[in-house]
Amino acid sequence: MKKFFVLALAAVMMAAPAEAKKKKKNAAPVKTEVRTPAKNGLFNVQFHKDKYYFQIPDSLLGRLLMVNTRFVSTPVDAGVYGGELANSQVLYWEKRGKQMYLRANLYDTRTDSTDAIALAVKNSTQDPIVFNAKIDSTVTDSTGAKLYSVEVTGLFNSDIDVFAINSNMKSRLGIANYKKDLSYIDYIHTFPINTEVVTVRTFASKALTKLPAGQATGNVTLKMNTSFVLLPKEPMKFRTFDPRVGYFTEEFNEFSDNQQEVTRKKVVTRYRLVPKDIEAYKRGELVEPVKQIVYYIDPATPAKWRPYLKAGVEDWNVAFEAAGFKNAIAAKDWPNDSTMSLEDARYSVIRYLASDIPNAYGPHCSDPRTGEILESHVGWYHNVMQLLHSWYQVQAGCVDKRAQKPEFDDELMGQLIRFVSSHEIGHTLGLRHNMGASSATPVEKLRDKAWVEEHGHTASIMDYARFNYVAQPEDNISEKGIFPRINDYDKWAINWGYRYFPDAKDAEEERLILNKMTIAKLKESPRYWFGGEGSDNDPHAQTEDLGDDAMKASDYGIKNLKRIVKKIPEWNYKEGDMDVQLKFAYKNVVAQMGRYMRHVATNISGCYHDFKSAEQDGVVYTPVSRATQKRALAWINANVFNEPTWLVSEPYVRRLNRVPENLIFGIADDVVDKLTSAMTINLVSKHSYMPDGYKPMEYITDLVNYVFSSTVSGKKTSLWTKHIQRKVVANLAKAWRVNMVDEQKPYALAGLNMIKGRLQKARTADADTRAHYADLLMQIRIALSGMPQMSGSSANSRPDGM
């Protein structure tokens, strides 16, 4: 008993100090972490102790977000500029337990959720997880909705792929590893339907980087903006693509219980335009849209050019009127509002880029589910004016005296800017290039003052038709007949893409309505034809060409070039200029001549295309006739194989190069490469089986007769003729030796043997010409001495003699 008492007393004595410490600890004031209030928006944003948090509403879980990352500022000589797109993704948040996951939605399949196959589609389209974070806390807003707080500092202060510069761009910039310690989040702003994250990112530069920043410091720093934009809860009704009308597209595989094959669906990209007054719209009245399309002008744009950029935007209203809308599109100055950001994905902006690149471009970002265009940031390079000066002087200098000076007046340059603005805005509205539009105009109409001023020289501003180079000085054609404009095709294309069908129950019903409209329109006039992007060997759909006959149009073009080449020293004179301006202007003349050559050469092996639906009669593909191909080859003989001495005979040309022909050999090379390529000979052969085809042996014989006429005449060969003859021999040898077995091989061989026979029989008193012929014979013997090699062979011998 006594023992127990002693032990109990000892226990009490030992516990007393511990209890005292506990009471003392409890008596201290309790510290609770107080965070700054969150800023409300798409995601509420909170900043605390150098960390950023997103509060993600329960209602946004699973909702698709368009996430665009753009450059804000870039290093000197980067070749990319503030406002340009670096990355675009569709992401969504997913909650599992106490973790929040960010997934990328790779939208390549579509199915009706009520179909049984929807489960199979889901099981074969697992979306990748790109980020996860523990839910830091859960809060409730004033409406009772739950918001999950997650730290996102690591999401943005890293080089995560969905926000990163892609590998091609990194290679172009010469940058390598991301340097986290030299990177940071600048700020995060949040708005009702979007959240904007601005970061500063530093990368180690590669050893051979061309960027001055990388060369000087080993580092390259860029400022980036990532926009999270909530995609519409109610997707827009999509419009099915039709190859007879030129729109950009979104694509996906469509699965359905009621199909016997998977459909690769293409839907066109376009803004969501809905009439404010449906009943008035049905009555055929022009109606304003519920939401106007608005483009803001970058405040960095020189003030004198802003009105012309705006006019180029608003010129599209005439096309939207064809679709039943008025005041559908507008251009506005950027407001003096600190809450607005040029990188904000809610706003479409014409960004003015301080670049020496002579160009402009018109991209857009669209909802991959439907093609709905959400925004656009047009890239307008400052030096596009150099390109406009070059085009206009060399194409219109003979018919517009305003073009006859080294620097245009502001009104002329402004109107040129206006036309390019309209072209680029056309792209942002969803329209592709229509390189076939100019072929709807007969060449002689391009010289008809009354006709061309009323109708324009091309049916579409989306063509690369530039200016009316066919018009001659005596035609007295004004700017209206020289400049492109929003024209018949453009109005039709906007009507097709933006016409609202209030009574159509679904996209399929709209497709059938539009098909009938398209058939009727194409019957009405060839001016509504869409010719594609000019990459399919169709002579009617080429870049930089005019009219329905390349030989006639080029004849008129050359007549003007012969005048211009004499005048460019006078038109481009600048005191103290060391012929820099003169050489640049001369190169533009040569380049224009090269375009005329290519326009004609495309006829050889060319094939017209005209897409048709099942209801339309006729063929889709029609090879160019034998007569037209022979006429094209004869034209090339007259204008290329026979040296265009007028290009090099002006005295000033010897100020530009010690051998004037060096300045124009490129014209010959381009044409000969086209005429003697394996592809051209192959297509001539395959098309020859069609009615009225150009037989390949006839083609090769004609070509050899033209190029090697000197072997019969006995004349001394010029530097120009030698160059072309060597090029033909080298190319035919290549077509026979290097390419895989195909139609071109026997005809390339036949061509070499024809040339060999001519050279062996040739008689000339000129020793230099005899030496040249002997060299060509040796090159042919070398080329034919071995067996033909298959594509990919390690043998690299090129019997080009050059």
Show the residue positions of the predicted features.
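Stable alpha-helical elements in mature extracytoplasmic
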Residues: 305-312, 413, 417, 421, ...
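Conserved catalytic/binding loops enriched for acidic/polar residues
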Residues: 438-802
